[in-house]
């Protein structure tokens, strides 16, 4: 594990969280890393796809690798099946203990291509509105909203909402 990069994530100073978060091949296994500040427990839950011959997959508990809420698990798989996180939070003064299920935005590749970026930089991308902003879509069976903004001088950009308790440390976006 790359501790300087983990610190960049926990301090919200990382300009490419996809480089660390989500699934990454490690030999014949996959290292899955996630950041959920304040969570006590995170489990990888395999979605059932209904494919013929699909093997039964056991949920994988993730290890709390950093007390700031950084979790990791080494999964015995050369390729990741569709999954989601089950995140458990303990009781605090503000709220009772609860759990939530959420997808992993970091398992998806950017929807803005190098060609899009080159055309935009040259001032000839006449349909950039199709790429920037908020766009509901489905990627690899995950339904959600894709976000992209042009913020060349921003130190960090995050997507926030009630789905992440308006916490800007979560759902950090990558600089393209």
Model regions and ranges:
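Non-catalytic, glycine-rich low-complexity segments
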Residues: 1-38, 97-155
